[in-house]
């Protein structure tokens, strides 16, 4: 048996495949046959409540999924993660984002050294800097305080900070303005700074290597913009730029005082870094105490994931359900539906976390898989999505499992708003599960010709995740829940969720193309005929504009 077939050849996988072939139950049947199902098929930990009763599962299904987790060595993989073993095999690194939120006094050893004190040294430096900026004691080059913060990064250096800022805006200092620049499209930078005063603006340049093309292009443009505001005075850079990086030489060359460089480690992957120094903009927005509360939330979920039995382990259950639909029901996507406007960027954040992690086609030992890996994650906040894509989920031909996320207590209690919002959460999950039969439609006097259009098949599965209130701590728990669900999936699929070689080829080709686009002479093109034609067309139109 080849390495790639170890999964599909294991007994639990075969049993699940047989179980799926015999599956003929509708969610209506499952609830009718088990009056206590809605209370029984739930799990609760660290302040998060998961209702997974509206899924295609019986006790037998759960038993087989849990057996799959055991047979594929999930327990050992979890321990290897937390022990700091080099589980990122292709880069020969640990993947120790859990160390970023480990409390002081704990120990996680990498290459013979406890890294937790290093983590807290950086956090303490971040906190001291945040206090200076937030209090107004950090002065810009003109002597004015900082009123605007612009985070420049891309990928994990942008998606996490943007999501966290939006999610925790309720807790932010509203006297500070925050902007985020990631796209190399000049519009992104131009719009971010068009109404800002250079004398009151601080740039955070977030790039581990300080060589990332998009980030350093935007950083150079920001530097030029700042110097224009200070009539070319190079000394201004040190008071208006800080770096999140590990490349001291490049940071200094840029003009940033290396005392204002906040580092992190090669065992922190970009999409797992929002709770590292990459979260400096988050700390500036919400303050050090709230940031530490967020870290405490992450850590609480870490402990739960590591210690809870799989049958009540929230990330494990969610990961197993994803595998059940992805690999046995051919469901290609997961809809993430937060009924909380502050979480409007959460689905976009999860897109990188899930698909960059598990969008892999070979196993850890380099063998091509013979099963599907990561589904596509997407979504929008409710109730907005109800008036756009929910139609397809309810009555379309695709099976789309959904994650509903909601909070019992509103941050803005305005009249009936929150009750109406929560009514929609519960109603949508119910409608997806149970639908509306032809008999129910016709009993209401609907004409026969119209009745089929009003039938809802139902049998659309969903999870509902409830928490008391959206707080920094709750956000940490929620992000860690999905981090560990992703890890659970990767362990069972036997893939590496911590590398991202798929982003490299386009970068390499882009370097070649930019040389051809900017050449003063007509370049000799060696691409395919389509790419060659587009390059020539672009060059021709650009020449007309010059």
Swiss-Prot record:
Which cysteines are cross-linked by disulfides?
Answer: none
Q: Which UniProt keywords are given for this protein, alphabetically ordered? A: Cytoplasm, Gluconeogenesis, Glycolysis, Isomerase
Enzyme Commission number(s) from the entry: 5.3.1.9
**Pathway where this protein functions:** Carbohydrate biosynthesis; gluconeogenesis; Carbohydrate degradation; glycolysis; D-glyceraldehyde 3-phosphate and glycerone phosphate from D-glucose: step 2/4
Question: Is rRNA processing tagged as a keyword?
Answer: no
Cytoplasm listed as a keyword: yes
Q: Which GO terms describe its cellular component?
A: cytosol
Primary localization class, coarse: cytoplasm
Domain of life per record: Bacteria
Query: What functional role does this protein have?
Result: Catalyzes the reversible isomerization of glucose-6-phosphate to fructose-6-phosphate.
Where is this protein localized, as stated in its record? Cytoplasm
NCBIfam families membership: PRK00179.1
| Protein name as catalogued | Glucose-6-phosphate isomerase
One GO biological process this protein is involved in is: glycolytic process
User: Which is an annotated GO molecular function term of this record?
Assistant: glucose-6-phosphate isomerase activity
Catalytic residues?
A: 356, 387, 507
Q: Give the family per the record.
A: Belongs to the GPI family.
Enzyme class (EC, first level): isomerase
Q: Which gene encodes it?
A: pgi
**Catalytic activity of the protein:** alpha-D-glucose 6-phosphate = beta-D-fructose 6-phosphate
């Amino acid at each position: 048996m080849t390495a790639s077939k170890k999964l599909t050849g294991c007994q639990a996988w075969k049993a699940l495949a047989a179980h799926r072939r015999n599956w003929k139950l509708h969610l209506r049947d499952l609830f009718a046959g088990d009056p206590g199902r809605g209370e029984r098929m739930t799990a609760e930990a660290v302040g998060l409540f998961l209702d997974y009763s509206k899924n295609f599962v019986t006790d037998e299904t759960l038993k087989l999924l849990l057996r799959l987790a055991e047979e594929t060595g999930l327990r050992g993989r979890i321990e290897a993660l937390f022990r700091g073993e080099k589980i990122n095999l292709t880069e020969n690194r640990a993947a120790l984002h859990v160390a970023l939120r480990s409390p002081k006094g704990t120990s996680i050893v990498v290459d013979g050294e406890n890294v937790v004190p290093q983590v807290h040294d950086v956090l303490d430096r971040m906190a001291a800097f945040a206090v200076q900026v937030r209090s107004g004691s950090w002065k810009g080059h003109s002597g004015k305080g900082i009123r605007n913060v612009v985070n420049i990064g891309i990928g994990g250096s942008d998606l996490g900070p943007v999501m966290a800022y939006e999610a925790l805006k309720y807790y932010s200092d509203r006297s500070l303005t925050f902007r985020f620049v990631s796209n190399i499209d000049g519009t992104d930078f131009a719009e971010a700074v068009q109404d800002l005063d250079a004398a009151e603006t601080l740039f955070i340049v977030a790039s581990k290597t300080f060589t990332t093309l998009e980030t350093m292009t935007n950083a150079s443009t920001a530097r030029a913009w700042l110097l224009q505001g200070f009539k070319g005075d190079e000394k201004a850079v040190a008071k208006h730029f800080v770096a999140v990086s590990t490349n001291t030489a490049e940071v200094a060359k840029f003009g940033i005082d290396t005392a204002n460089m906040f580092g992190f480690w090669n065992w922190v992957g970009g999409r797992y870094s929002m709770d590292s120094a990459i979260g400096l903009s988050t700390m500036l927005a919400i303050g050090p105490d709230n940031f530490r509360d967020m870290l405490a939330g992450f850590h609480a979920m870490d402990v739960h994931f590591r210690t809870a039995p799989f049958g009540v382990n929230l990330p494990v259950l969610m990961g197993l359900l994803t595998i059940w639909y992805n690999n046995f029901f051919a469901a290609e996507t997961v809809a993430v539906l937060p009924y909380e406007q502050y979480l409007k960027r959460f689905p976009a954040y999860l897109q990188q976390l899930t698909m960059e992690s598990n969008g892999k086609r070979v196993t850890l030992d380099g063998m091509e898989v013979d099963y599907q890996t990561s589904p596509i994650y997407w979504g929008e906040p409710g109730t907005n999505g109800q008036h756009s894509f929910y139609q397809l989920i309810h009555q379309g031909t695709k099976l789309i499992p959904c994650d509903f996320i909601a909070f019992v207590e509103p941050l803005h209690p305005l009249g009936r708003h929150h009750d109406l919002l929560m009514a929609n959460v519960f109603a949508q999950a119910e409608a997806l599960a149970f639908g509306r039969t032809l008999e129910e439609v016709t009993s209401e006097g609907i004409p026969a010709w119209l009745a089929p259009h009003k039938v809802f098949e139902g049998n659309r599965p969903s999870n509902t995740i409830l928490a008391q209130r959206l707080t920094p701590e709750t956000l940490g728990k929620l992000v860690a829940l999905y981090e560990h669900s992703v890890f659970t999936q990767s362990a069972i699929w036997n893939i590496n969720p911590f590398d991202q070689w798929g982003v490299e080829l386009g970068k390499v080709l882009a370097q070649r193309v930019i040389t051809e686009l900017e050449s003063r002479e007509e370049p000799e093109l060696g691409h395919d005929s389509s790419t060659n034609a587009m390059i020539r067309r672009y060059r021709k139109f650009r020449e007309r504009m010059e």
